[in-house]
């Protein structure tokens, strides 16, 4: 059993009111993505539970590879689904966890219109479907990017709001995530929808997609190919980070214990480090070095100007959540080992 699999099982053993999910249908969009896929794995690790998990994604082949161990489990169902289109059919979904969103920066430059449409219209379509099909709670997976640029070095709380330059294509992601959050709260106010929101910090872990060009994915690929770690900035940006199993577990705490209409930051307060620190740690673990390269113009377009993005998690921790055992260096090592296992 891999270390990652142990993390999944340990997350599934958390002291949560799992009985709330009994005999319920749970829809997870973005199920082949980094966070959504991990969430599906944690839910399916409860073999004795009677709920059904509906994993929605665009790529059935990728889903089969990811969820092969569950594919013939009667409680697991794959739905071919593109978030930009309305959900078809008449299936009842008591819980909808909306984790589908293209968070890869390269697409912020290539397809900003599609990013906005999928984040806003996709959220509205899912809530409307749920309202007519037995929805009990809607969990929206937003992003820490909604905070924008803060002032000074203060950790963001859920009531903070920083500056986002809306007159740039790069704003397509944080601005549409903000709009989708407001949409959730508006549905709660006008139609009584029970909606909760999570704002994950920078999340890392195994099973990211091949098209994901976020910085940690690039670094991991360098390691897997036996290359030096390539950086295209000075890497001084400070970030809150969270291991994917910790993030998915936090989402379940919010789903089952969170207060209606509220938003919750997700971050590991013991994992605050710069992008350069991550690069140097991975290089050290792999016996390589960090090298610097000049970014291409297309890459510069999607660089964020946010130098400090650290999140306070008091509100989340008040629900009972805490990260799994192990420091971030160990969890990076788990990520590499799982990716190597997958490659073999």
Predicted regions and their residues:
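Active-site Tyr-X1-5-Lys
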Residues: 168-196, 224-225
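N-terminal Rossmann NAD(P)H-binding glycine-rich loop of SDR-like oxidoreductase domains
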Residues: 25-45
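NAD(P)H-binding glycine-rich loop region in Rossmannoid oxidoreductase-like domains
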Residues: 80-118
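Conserved Rossmann-fold NAD(P)-dependent oxidoreductase catalytic core, especially the SDR/UDP-sugar
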Residues: 98, 124-171
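Glycine/proline-rich active-site loop of Rossmann-fold NAD(P)-dependent oxidoreductases
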Residues: 178, 194, 203-218, 227, ...
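Amphipathic terminal alpha-helices
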Residues: 1-20, 50-51, 326-344
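Conserved C-terminal active-site "lid" loop/helix of NAD(P)H-dependent oxidoreductases
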Residues: 244, 277, 299-323
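Mid/C-terminal beta-alpha module of Rossmann-like enzyme folds, strongest
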Residues: 257-301
